[in-house]
């Protein structure tokens, strides 16, 4: 007789886990040093003076008790200023695994197509919603214009040079956020 069992290991990851100021400062130092020593085109599109400004901006925005999402927001903002489409900040493996199991109520339910001055619903993940249908033009969300939302999100997306097409495509493919 063979008896087998299957146990599921409950993940100990929590997206609300807080990291100390010392932890995020140490990680930020490593992040900056790696970019400054090994990035082949750190100053192609952004001058050293400007990158120093953005690195300092990032340091100033580190605070005690940051979640991974809050820390990554600082890193993605600074990284986007390099203007290198091959340089980006990803979630930890644990966070990515958590995202694969997230419920609809905790994520933005719409897929949209974004270009110059328009944002259009391409899919609504909430099948019970009969208002936001495919093809609907979004002019604002929570009283913030779609163009203001796009401009804010652009600040966190890396791209080659000053190319905006990739940023529109990233938003249109549910990427990055």
What are the functions of these language-model segments?
Residues 2-5:
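C-terminal motif of bacterial Sec signal peptides marking the signal peptidase cleavage site
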């Amino acid at each position: 007789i063979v008896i087998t069992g299957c146990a599921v290991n409950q993940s100990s990851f929590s997206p609300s886990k807080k990291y100390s100021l010392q932890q995020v400062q140490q990680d930020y130092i490593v992040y900056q040093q790696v970019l400054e020593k090994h990035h082949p085109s750190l100053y192609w599109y952004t001058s050293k003076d400007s990158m120093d400004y953005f690195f300092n901006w990032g340091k100033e925005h580190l605070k005690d008790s940051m979640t991974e999402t809050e820390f990554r927001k600082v890193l993605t903002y600074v990284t986007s200023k390099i203007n290198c489409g091959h340089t980006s900040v990803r979630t930890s493996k644990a966070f990515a695994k958590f995202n694969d199991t997230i419920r609809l109520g905790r994520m933005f339910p719409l897929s949209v197509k974004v270009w110059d001055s328009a944002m259009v619903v391409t899919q609504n993940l909430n099948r019970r919603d009969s208002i936001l249908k495919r093809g609907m033009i979004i002019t604002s969300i929570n009283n913030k214009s779609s163009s203001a939302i796009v401009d804010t999100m652009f600040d966190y997306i890396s791209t080659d040079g000053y190319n905006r097409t990739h940023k529109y495509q990233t938003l249109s493919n549910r990427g990055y956020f």
